[in-house]
Amino acid sequence: MKILALDSSGLVASVAVVEVDTLLGEYTINYMKTHSQTLLPMLDEVAKMIELDLNTVDVIAVSAGPGSFTGLRIGSATAKGLALALHKKIVSVPTVDALAYNLWNSPSLVCPLMDARRQQTYTGLYKFTDGTMDTVLPQCVVGIQEIIEKINEMGEAVTFLGDGVPVFREYIEENLKVPFSFAPAHCNKQRGASVAVLGAILYAQGKAEDAADHKPEYLRMSQAERERKEKERDFRI
């Protein structure tokens, strides 16, 4: 099976193609350009380099959230457009799960941290047992203090990764009471390859969907939505 994977959920944009257990190509960039400028050119470049006929792709996997609202919309719109044009299914891969999968078979707890602003983080907790990733805490949006308290209660060593690490590193170092480490550069941000491999697992579980049914998983309202609700509430008062 051949999977095309897209991830534009955070600062990183990544495109990958995986066939069975082989990574045919991956293009990842973390630079000062919007994903609307980079994602399709990256896909085009990968397709050229590996001589990919998009019609041979079996399914499209996309990092479906949480994350940057704009980034998620770009990734989902790109995946939907491709799926509709190619008559393929989409597999929605939870962003935090895919991040955790970067550290496959880690002996410690894995805790992805994505900066959700306002001292909050998109996060979760994961363990690997005999090559299988088990979810200890499903992806969620919480205050950084809440996830650190949870880890302290569990009393297990943990490895952190994600764009939230630089934001919360000082807090972690001051408040965490268990052994901890930070993932190195080659595996500490979103990767299309992880989205593809986890997407293959979800596809085998029958979790593919029609393009028309796909939508991002934001986990919370946008700033504009919150402000609108506040105005509506004030108006009712």
Segments the model singles out, each with a brief description of its role:
Residues M1-A64:
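N-terminal beta-alpha supersecondary unit
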Residues N30-T38, F69, R73, A77, ...:
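Residues at secondary-structure transition points
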Residues V46-I50, A85, L103, G192-Y203:
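Stable alpha-helical structural segments in soluble proteins, enriched in small hydrophobic residues
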Residues V62-I90, T95:
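DPxDG-like acidic metal-binding loop motif
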Residues S181-I237:
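Acyltransferase
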